[in-house]
Swiss-Prot record:
This is Energy-coupling factor transporter transmembrane protein EcfT. Transmembrane (T) component of an energy-coupling factor (ECF) ABC-transporter complex. Unlike classic ABC transporters this ECF transporter provides the energy necessary to transport a number of different substrates. One of its GO terms (molecular function) is transmembrane transporter activity. InterPro entries: ABC/ECF_trnsptr_transmembrane, EcfT. The chain crosses the membrane at residues 29-49, 63-83, 94-114, 117-137, 143-163, 243-263. Belongs to the energy-coupling factor EcfT family. It is a multi-pass membrane protein. One of its GO terms (cellular component) is plasma membrane. HAMAP family: EcfT. Forms a stable energy-coupling factor (ECF) transporter complex composed of 2 membrane-embedded substrate-binding proteins (S component), 2 ATP-binding proteins (A component) and 2 transmembrane proteins (T component). May be able to interact with more than 1 S component at a time. The gene is ecfT. It is found in: Cell membrane. It comes from Listeria innocua serovar 6a (strain ATCC BAA-680 / CLIP 11262). Keywords: Cell membrane, Membrane, Transmembrane, Transmembrane helix, Transport.
Amino acid sequence: MMEKMILGRYIPGNSWLHRIDPRAKITAVMAFIAIVFLANNWLTYALMFAYVLYLVLTSKVPFLFFIKGLQPIFWLILITLLLQVFFTKGGTVLVDLGLLQITTLGLANGAMMFCRFVLIIFMTTLLTLTTSPIELTDGLEKILAPFRLVHLPVHELALMLSISLRFIPTLMDETEKILKAQKARGVEFTSGKWSDRIKAIIPLLVPLFISAFKRAEDLAIAMEARGYRGGKGRTRFRLLRWRFADTCLLISLAVLSGLLFWLRS
């Protein structure tokens, strides 16, 4: 189960996407998530899938990683799809089950909702797979820099977001280990009464919380040992430099947005 958790993992590489400035990648992903909702016909969705597929293939990250990125939210996607299919009224009725009806409009809305999930997950997965934790932190800090004017602790906030994101796969791996250890002791998580299943989760949560606090403490000690004192006076080994390729990425996204507006039905 935990091997399916891809969000938060970084795959080292030397593709052009790995070399893109993290500020450009973060901005592009945020903008892409916003323009996903501009698509309202199959031509616009086909255009967006072509754009994402190009980025995925040129990132040189195995495509299987992106498929695995969908698996943790499979049930959420399925439930959303079924709600759209059965409760959307309009179009031609294909199946009439009394209170529930399957219509052509419901199927179309369900398929489009599925496409939106896939596009958003692929883009966010692409961001974390091609951006190292340090780059992600620096990129977020630069983007949030204007908020320093209102005395927002930008550096600490960016670091917190980056660490939280990177801790997701670590905690999931830890959960997998504890789960296997509990099963080896005869604990059943998938059978019996619901009350028994809930009680069985407690031996899983307690060591998980202890492990999370221990890892957080170890990380804090390691950062202090390296002289970390927050953003004040901090120097960087690698400085972010905006390049022509970064501008091209944002221009391509602007062109995509313009095409989506033009092709909207």
